[in-house]
A protein has these predicted regions:
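Iron-sulfur (Fe-S) cluster-binding modules
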Residues: 1-30, 36-56, 98
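Catalytic cores of large soluble enzymes that bind and process phosphate-bearing ligands
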Residues: 31-35, 77-80
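A short beta-strand-loop structural module common to alpha/beta enzyme folds
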Residues: 56-62
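Thiamine diphosphate
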Residues: 63-115
Length: 115
């Protein structure tokens, strides 16, 4: 089974805006000046530009500050074990290829701890 995102599966011609992907929660526990605010803003803009349907979006994260990102995205959410966000996201895609999957993680989560 191919785990590569096929554009026609998740993108449509509906004119989504970044606010369509923003959950009701407002990030308030990242440190002032933290780069995660920029990552969140960039992700919301990219999802809108690509036209990913929020009802067909899954956000997967591991442990750490970056793991909070899915809570601010209007999507299905999965908080996984440290170092397992990538494998879990792959499993989600293999089980539900009709859904778009976004993974967030930090350096420890992605490269050195738990994997």
């Amino acid at each position: 089974m191919n785990a590569i995102l096929q554009p026609h599966q998740h993108f449509n011609k509906v004119d989504f805006k970044p606010k369509d992907y923003k959950d009701e929660k407002t990030p308030s526990f990242w440190c002032a000046g933290c780069g995660h605010y920029g990552v969140l803003t960039g992700l919301l803009r990219a999802l809108a530009e690509l036209g990913v349907d929020p009802n067909h979006l899954v956000s997967v994260s591991g442990i750490g500050c970056s793991s909070r990102l899915p809570y601010f995205v209007n999507s299905y959410k999965m908080h996984t074990l440290h170092g397992r966000a990538g494998p879990v996201a792959t499993g989600v895609h293999l089980a539900r290829p009709d859904l778009a999957v976004v993974v967030s993680g930090g350096d420890g989560d992605g490269f050195s701890i738990g994997g």
